[in-house]
Amino acid sequence: MPAPTPKRADGRGATELRPFSVDWDPMSFALSSLIVRTGRTAVLCSVSLEEDVPRWRRGNGCGWLSAEYRLLPGSTPQRQSRELMKLSGRTQEIQRLIGRSLRAVLDMDALGERTLLIDCDVIQADAGTRTASITGAWIALRRACDLLRSQGVLTQDPIRQQLAAVSVGLIDGTPLLDLDYSEDSRADVDLNVVTAGDGRLLELQGTAEQAPFSRSELDAMLNLAESGLQELMQGQRHALATAAGSAIS
């Protein structure tokens, strides 16, 4: 007899995403900005442009993309101290993940010698901040590139394809999609999945928190993530359709 599906605090089914939404233009001076919300998790994502590249990148006509990630002080139940002189290992890991994922779907040659700077600042953390950051940052990046093309700054579209990320967990033997904190903190397995629009994987981050997991359990979690990512990508396209200056509909 199969184990009963764990009850989720917010009433969702095992295969349901948290509510997903995007609020546009919270910042007047950024090239592109938005607040992405997945349930109670909210991340401010913004894109800025620099007409330069890192020194080691100069002279070859190619651009660059860099990402920064921070938890704002009031984003968690206990205040997060600002990371000033030294970043925590977690912060460094996450911002590298964000930058690495976005660069994988970006044509650096099409940028010319310019740098796109991505900032992801967590306003409220209820788990899934890294996946929300990636999903929201891609939307902001897509719009920024559309605006740069409309202004004549870019002559080619540097974005090769879509990108999104989601978490999956295993609780009491049952795969659950898009964990909130109450689930993430007790999951037997925590898995973050990043994929491109064509379905190919960009990154898997999986950890057995309590006990090893099987190949069949991994496959079940990946299948669940795939369905959630398709839905998130629809949400991305819908968000872009509501924003001026985007080519996606």
Curated annotation (Swiss-Prot):
Entry keyword annotation includes tRNA processing: yes
Keywords attached to this entry: Nucleotidyltransferase, RNA-binding, rRNA processing, Transferase, tRNA processing, tRNA-binding
Residues involved in phosphate binding: 90, 128-130
Catalytic activity, EC: 2.7.7.56
Enzyme class of the recorded protein, top EC level: transferase
Entry annotated with the keyword tRNA-binding: yes
Family: Belongs to the RNase PH family.
Subunit structure and binding partners: Homohexameric ring arranged as a trimer of dimers.
Function: Phosphorolytic 3'-5' exoribonuclease that plays an important role in tRNA 3'-end maturation. Removes nucleotide residues following the 3'-CCA terminus of tRNAs; can also add nucleotides to the ends of RNA molecules by using nucleoside diphosphates as substrates, but this may not be physiologically important. Probably plays a role in initiation of 16S rRNA degradation (leading to ribosome degradation) during starvation.
Record's protein name: Ribonuclease PH
UniProt organism field: Parasynechococcus marenigrum (strain WH8102)
